[in-house]
């Protein structure tokens, strides 16, 4: 199959029929240049699924070096307004009453039968503003439905944000070479603002792997190519490679996937 991206043709066994219903990311062209061998689709957006010849080769590189991952498919659901805390509380058994600004929570979302519908990372940006960095389901529609049904005073949107992950034991040295020594003080599952090309961008110490790593919540599609190239050039010193969620690494870390593989609607958070 030929997958076309703005003049770039990529032979793939992914089985995808490309259309406007499948969204590209700011990094898609760089991902193709880096040698991606296939894609899957999460939240209606492309997610690279393989680069290396084997998953074992990818695992050993990830556990010893650093990788750059296009995880733009982690769409953000922004909930803002005077009732934002009330709505976010309603969607999960985990309380956010004492959640500080700048913190990330693993946040299992449940339906009316307490079944799992998503397991996002929750970020608190201000007293009345939250981001849900979601796995593969339509959380935006679920949140809007609850807000309308409860007559809550909130504004719910999908912001122009495209996460890029830097994972692996050398990720801290790589990131500090670009964003400064301040980033070394960032604790696990916390975030802060860092400057890039004259803009303020959120970076969290988190990621899909059990390795040390960071996620850059890039605001602005147009900055994607520059961000990738900046990290790639700086990363050559640290044996950087393109990557994607690795099944061996995730199983070792006890990191389950929503997407109806390990966790689905009949699954309760206490199981």
Whereabouts are the PLM-identified features?
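Acidic, proline/glycine-enriched N-terminal capping motif
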Residues: 2-107, 115
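Ser/Thr-centric signal marking residues that sit
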Residues: 25, 209, 267-268
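Conserved adenylation A10 loop of the ANL superfamily
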Residues: 70, 209, 263
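Acidic, low-complexity central loop/insert segments
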Residues: 118-257
């Amino acid at each position: 199959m030929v997958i076309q991206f703005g003049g770039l043709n990529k032979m793939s066994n992914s089985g995808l029929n490309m259309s406007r219903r499948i969204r590209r990311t700011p990094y898609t062209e760089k991902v193709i240049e880096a040698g991606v061998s296939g894609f899957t689709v999460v939240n209606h957006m492309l997610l690279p699924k393989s680069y290396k010849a084997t998953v074992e080769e990818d695992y050993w590189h990830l556990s010893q070096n650093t990788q750059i991952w296009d995880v733009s498919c982690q769409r953000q659901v922004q909930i803002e307004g005077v009732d934002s805390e009330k709505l976010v509380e309603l969607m999960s058994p985990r309380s956010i009453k004492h959640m500080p600004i700048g913190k990330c929570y693993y946040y299992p979302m449940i339906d009316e039968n307490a079944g799992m519908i998503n397991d996002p990372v929750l970020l608190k940006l201000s007293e009345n503003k939250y981001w849900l960095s979601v796995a593969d389901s339509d959380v935006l529609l679920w949140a809007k439905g609850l807000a309308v049904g409860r007559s809550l005073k909130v504004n719910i949107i999908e912001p122009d944000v495209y996460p890029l992950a830097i994972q692996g034991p050398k990720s801290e040295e790589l990131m500090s070479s670009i964003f400064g020594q301040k980033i070394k003080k960032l604790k696990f599952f916390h975030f802060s603002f860092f400057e890039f090309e004259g803009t303020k961008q959120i970076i969290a110490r988190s990621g899909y792997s059990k390795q040390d790593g960071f996620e850059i919540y890039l605001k602005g599609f147009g900055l994607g190519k520059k961000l990738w190239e900046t990290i790639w050039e700086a990363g050559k010193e640290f044996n950087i490679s393109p990557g994607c969620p690795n099944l061996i690494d995730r199983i070792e870390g006890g990191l389950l996937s929503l997407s109806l593989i390990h966790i689905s609607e009949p699954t309760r958070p206490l199981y």
